[in-house]
């Protein structure tokens, strides 16, 4: 808040955006690029080097996968964008379910080589249940 008690960014300019897909489709890598190009990070973190901003747990860094949904904030134009990077492994589907409840929209990533994979279909159906609007992002081209 500012000195006069008002929000620095009005609530109407907040966006809660989820990143969802099958494991290894590039969710965390894409999130790292968003953070870099919006000026949030000065360096792009790499999943397989254990330097990704969003994979903060030691086990995530060791395994190179997202285990828990992680949230961060960046800014674009006049908007505050809260990004939630969700796990892609089937064992962590409930993490995606929890995140969907607060999303204004989601980016659904698809690996251009692997195509539509089972967990992508699962998270798509989950987003349908919560009425979350999505855009598709085809990755690894």
UniProtKB/Swiss-Prot annotation:
One cellular component term from this protein's GO annotations in UniProt: chloroplast
Keywords: Chloroplast, Elongation factor, GTP-binding, Nucleotide-binding, Plastid, Protein biosynthesis
Coiled coil: none
Family: Belongs to the TRAFAC class translation factor GTPase superfamily. Classic translation factor GTPase family. EF-G/EF-2 subfamily.
Xref: InterPro entries: G_TR_CS, P-loop_NTPase, Small_GTP-bd, T_Tr_GTP-bd_dom
Source organism (scientific name): Pisum sativum
Protein name in UniProt: Elongation factor G, chloroplastic
GO biological process, one term: ribosome disassembly
Binding positions for GTP per the UniProt entry: 21-28, 85-89
